[in-house]
Amino acid sequence: MKKALATILALVMAIGLCSVSWADDPVTLKVDPSVSYTTAPARAADATYKTIAEAITAAQAGDTIALVNDLTVDGDSYTEVKKALTIDFGEYTMTVAAGGGFDVYSDLTLKNGTLECLKWAAWVQKGAKLTVAADMVINATSTDANKGGITVQNTGSEVTVYGKVTAAGGAAISGIGNASDGGVTINIEDGAVVTNTNDGGLGIYFPNTSNLNIKGGTITGATGIYVKCGSVSVTGGTIVGNGAKADYAYYGNGGNPTGEALVIDKCNYPGGDPAVSITGGTFSSTNANAVGSYVGNNATGVVTGFITGGTFSSDVDAYVAADKIVQKDGGAYKVVADGAITSGTYTSQPTVPSGYKATKNDDGTWTVTKISYYYYPSTSDTTTSTTTKGSPKTFDAGIALYVGMALTSAAGVAFVGKKRED
C-alpha cells in the first residue's frame, strides 16, 4: 500500500512539474482589431486579442505577439513593455496617429512590418534592449525638435538597428544628455537605414556615455551624426550631412546642425569628453565639410587624431592620426598610412622612400612620382668616330649617372664622364 501511494505521489509531482513547464513555454499571441469578445481570452497559443496592450498584458516573457491585421492605436500615450517580447508585425502596419510607439522597460524585438507613429517610436530605458530587425520599418512623423524615432537612456540600455528608422523631428535616434541617463549603447548594423527628413534634424544625436558603434548602414541628417560625449567607433557605413552649411554654435539642450556628416562637440557635457575612433566608413556632406571638430561651453582643445581610415568628401587632414595621411582621389579623400608612399596625390607632404619624390602642386596638394633620368648612350656602332645620338633612355635612381660628353681633337673622339648629383 505504501509503495502504491509513493508511486501515485511521484506521478502527481511529475504532472505538476510538467504543467509548470508547459505554462512557461513561449507561445504566440495574436492581435486582430476585428475580433469581438466581452472578456479578453487567457494566455494560450494563438489566442487573439483586439488590442496590442491586451496581448502584452496576457503575455509572459519570451512570448511572441503577432499582428494578423493592420492595427490602429488610439490615444496620445505609449504602449508599455515590461517583459521580454518579440512583436512580429506580419507585414502589417501599426499606426499611432496621436501618440508614440512603445515605452520599453524590458528586451523587445520589432520585426517584419511597419510602425507609424507621431511621437517617439520607442523609448528604451532601465537597462532594456531594443532590436529593430532588418525587415522592420519605423516612421515617426512629428516635426517637433524634442521628438524623433528612437531614444535611449539609463545604464545598460541598448538599441541595435538592422532595419529602417525614419524621423521628422530633432533626431532619428538619440541619447539623453543628463548625468543619470548615460551608460547606453547604440549599434547601427550593416543594412540599416537611419534618416531624418527635417531640414534641421540630426541622424543620430549622442550626448552621453557609453558606446555608439557604427558598423554599417546609411545615416542621413542635416548633420548625420552629432557627438558630445561617450565612446564612438565607426568601422563602416555611410554617413551623410545634407543640411545647409552653418557655423558651429554651442547649444546646451541638443545640437545645432552644421551641414557636416559628423560633428564632434567637446563642450563640458555631463558625460565627459568624447572619445572617437574612425577606422572606416564613408562621410559625405552636400554643402559643408565632411567632418567638424569643435569646442564650446568653455571647453578647450578640439578633438583631433581620431581618424585612421575611411573616405571623405573633403580634406580631413586636421583630424587624422600622426601616422596617417589624406590621399586625394578625384573628388574623394581617403585616409591611408603615411610612409613608403610611391604614387598618388595627397593634401599634405607625404613620406616617400628612396627613389621617389613628392612635388607640391599649385593647389597645395602633393604628387608622388618615381625619380627617373634621361641620358643619350652611343649607338650600337662600335666605331669610335661616330657622333650619332641614340634614343633617350630612362635610368633608375640610385645608380651613378654618367653623361658622355664628346670632345673632338686631332687624335679622334674622347669621352669625359660627368657625374650627375641629385
Each predicted region: which residue ranges?
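Extracellular disulfide-bonded cysteine-rich modules/repeats
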Residues: 323-326, 355-359
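Surface-exposed loop/turn motifs in large extracellular/passenger domains
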Residues: 80-88, 102-116, 123-141, 147-170, ...
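A cross-kingdom C-terminal cell-surface attachment/processing module
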Residues: 398-419
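Acidic Gly/Asp/Thr-rich repetitive segments characteristic of extracellular carbohydrate-active
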Residues: 28-68
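Sec-dependent signal peptide cleavage junction
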Residues: 15-27, 389-398, 417
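C-terminal low-complexity, Ser/Thr- and acidic/Pro-rich disordered "stalk" regions positioned immediately N-terminal
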Residues: 352-355, 362-394
